């Protein structure tokens, strides 16, 4: 079992304790630890899709079916951008979907790091983008 000291272990544990049985997504550099945390648990399953839009619509469908809260996970940059249409549909239809988006370390914000979506120094502002398709959006620091 992975050490319970990582933030991702706490996130996955909290999701599982809340009744979430599946996380849909595409693995990537800034989100891979979340999938590792899920792999060490028997009470939550990570379902990997071939595209982030597909993962977002899987989470939407999961929630619509009444199976539980739909959760989608993606990495920063292009990966997170690909979830926006699916999240927009869920938002417009008032379907609850939780999106978890990985980010580079905050010490690299605005310094040209790979797939920086911090909104600093000309980088894409992920929080502003997702605020348009969500009820609540915050970056955890």
Positions of predicted regions on the chain:
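N-terminal alpha/beta PP-like core and its mobile active-site loop of ThDP/TPP-dependent enzymes
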Residues: 1-141
